[in-house]
Amino acid sequence: MSDELKDNAAKEASFGAFLTRQLMKSVPAVTGNLDGKVAIVTGANVGLGLACARQLLSLQLSHLILAVRSLRKGEAAALELQASFPHARVEVWALEMESYASIQAFVSRCHSELGRVDIAILNAGLALKRFQTCTNPQTTPREITLQVNFLSTVFLALLLLPILGAKKEKKDAVFIPGRLTLVGSDTVYWVNARELKSRPLLQAANSSEGFDGFEQYKMSKLFVLMFVAKLARDLVSPDQVIVNVACPGLCKGTAFVREPDSNWAKQAIVSSLIRLVGRTPEQGARVYLAAAILQGPKSHGSMISEGDILP
């Protein structure tokens, strides 16, 4: 994890720091050449995922896998991308993040059809207002935000590590570490610490008692950050795969909130804040690319925002 994160958390958690990040810190444009490389983007048919896919292709990416829940929506996005970037191979693969079986099938297909993946950006996520459990019969009934944003995301990340660290077929090719970027959020600064101390973490996150959708979202992203820090420190060398977390900030035009807020006043405040200070999906997606392409081994296990390693 970023060395100074724990020491700067209080400062970064202030509303003033949030506004500074949103309004005064520019998100750098990413340049480079991804010719010959293969990338996966989950949740890639809308919002930040689609903007990320478009930017990867603009850097001459050769092969892009759009990993999506809805094949119909994914195919529509792929047609648009293919028309704009005819040089690339754009494929749509099914990935249901509520199902471990779907995740395993997706990774099995990666091994059989791709051999090597250079970049994986795990963008799929959601936020719910009410407590709901997964309905997939192949998945243990858990709260959906916890399942999709954390448990399924880290399961997918672990399964992708071997193919991200695979060597190129050419024996004389210089090995370049794979890149694995999980999408986080700077809302981790606002997690209720008392709740984390009251009982085991997963037990607290899987309880309907006093459920708060925004608190659940923040907690799920904190778990992702903790996982990446542990993974990078103890299990994965940056010489094989560079793993980090990208925080796009508050963005407009995203579709991760699956249901409207019944409190119209609260909804109006949130909508106004997004309209006034929210970044465009294109700006947010630049953070993904900065983490997955520009940042080197120093970012291993760290959180990236505005193109820089946080605090």
UniProtKB/Swiss-Prot annotation:
Keywords: NADP, Oxidoreductase
GO molecular-function term, one example from the UniProt record: oxidoreductase activity
Disruption phenotype: Does not affect the production of oxopyrrolidines A and B.
Pfam families: adh_short (PF00106)
Gene3D superfamilies referenced in this protein's UniProt entry, alphabetically: NAD(P)-binding Rossmann-like Domain
EC nos: 1.1.1.-
Active-site annotation: 217 (proton donor), 221 (lowers pka of active site tyr)
Enzyme class per UniProt: oxidoreductase
Keyword set includes NADP: yes
Pathway(s) it belongs to: Secondary metabolite biosynthesis
InterPro entries the UniProt entry points to: NAD(P)-bd_dom_sf, SDR_fam
Sequence positions that bind NADP(+): 48, 73, 96, 123, 217, 221
UniProt function note: Short chain dehydrogenase; part of the gene cluster that mediates the biosynthesis of oxopyrrolidines, polyketide-amino acid hybrid compounds with feature structures of tetramic acid. Does not seem to play a role in oxopyrrolidines A and B biosynthesis. May be involved in further modifications of these oxopyrrolidines.
Family: Belongs to the short-chain dehydrogenases/reductases (SDR) family.
Protein name per its UniProtKB record: Short chain dehydrogenase opdN
Source species of the chain: Penicillium oxalicum (strain 114-2 / CGMCC 5302)
Taxonomic lineage of the native organism: Eukaryota, Fungi, Dikarya, Ascomycota, Pezizomycotina
